[in-house]
Amino acid sequence: YVSLSPDSVFNIITDDISHQILSRSNCERSKRPKRVFSIYWNVPTFMCHQYGMNFDEVTDFNIKHNSKDNFRGETISIYYDPGKFPALMPLKNGNYEERNGGVPQRGNITIHLQQFNEDLDKMTPDKNFGGIGVIDFERWKPIFRQNWGNTEIHKKYSIELVRKEHPKWSESMIEAEATKKFEKYARYFMEETLKLAKKTRKRAKWGYYGFPYCYNVTPNNPGPDCDAKATIENDRLSWMYNNQEILFPSVYVRHEQKPEERVYLVQGRIKEAVRISNNLEHSPSVLAYWWYVYQDKMDIYLSETDVEKTFQEIVTNGGDGIIIWGSSSDVNSLSKCKRLREYLLNTLGPFAVNVTETVNGRSSLNF
């Protein structure tokens, strides 16, 4: 491991805070089965092989990873927009193209599931795959109200379909009907996708990336607590969480945020995922998706303080582990590969090994 001197920046956490982490995390996790706190590597560092560089050292820091730096492998695999979920696909001219009906209420489930099965066979041919399976689908949200920004087109399209069918209805009646239809079939597509994944790769542990959503640290909701409506809506998604072995809240932070806002963001999202897990009979694990760069400044790695604080919030609020994610654009040149490897060896790795050993009771925290 990297040698840490007493005056190192990693000593900023005292024994008192170490005790606080252990006592608080035990309290938060007490309602659920005690699990080994694990950190996973979900970065396409196989791309660095072309520069004669590998990342075998992740193992030295108690970080679980796929063999040969594979992005999808025996330990963890993420599937981006798999199958043929109904969606309105943006075109370069600003228009949209319907994929499989455009919105879930017009989609063909058979076409989607056949394609999903083919994608799974292509990307993970091993039927005995026993790792973590992450379905990353972000074209729309299964809660109608939550489709804003890039996904709002699906809400508008759904409303227009009902308006054409019932031109004399009031706007409130139209929106209510659009909501009902959209959410019914959104559930159908997402639920059947999970069921098929679990049926064909029985040994794997499955879940959807990003859920539960929280919508905290926003202009309208600046604090750590999740949006009140979102919390109620998360309870309505029990059909999804009941089919997941793992919850994957996303805790990517931004450079423009104040230091305390980054803490709030992680705190609220982990608490919400743990709350949901506690309310489910099978108590799914909570693994936070964590990115080592700032979401709005992707050329800047998280400071040591931000690594420390975000890891600390994941642990103390009851998370069961961390998935370190990275984009292909993070490792698409020799200089970027060198930078990431140096960051792993000098910053990220030491934090990872100290957190895992502390939470799992093998040492006292020594940042």
UniProtKB/Swiss-Prot annotation:
Cited InterPro entries: Aldolase_TIM (IPR013785), Glycoside_hydrolase_SF (IPR017853), Hyaluronidase (IPR018155), Venom_Hyaluronidase (IPR001329)
Gene Ontology process terms (BP): carbohydrate metabolic process; defense response; hyaluronan catabolic process
Disulfide bonds: 48-337, 214-226
EC number(s) from the headed UniProt entry: 3.2.1.35
Chain positions carrying an annotated carbohydrate: 108, 354
Transmembrane spans: none
Keywords assigned: Allergen, Disulfide bond, Glycoprotein, Glycosidase, Hydrolase, Signal, Zymogen
Gene3D superfamilies per record: Aldolase class I
Catalytic activity: Random hydrolysis of (1->4)-linkages between N-acetyl-beta-D-glucosamine and D-glucuronate residues in hyaluronate
Keyword Transmembrane belongs to the record: no
Record Pfam families: Glyco_hydro_56 (PF01630)
A single MF term (Gene Ontology): hyalurononglucosaminidase activity
Active site: 138 (proton donor)
The protein's role, per its UniProt record: May play a role in reproduction.
Family in the record: Belongs to the glycosyl hydrolase 56 family.
Protein name in the entry: Hyaluronidase
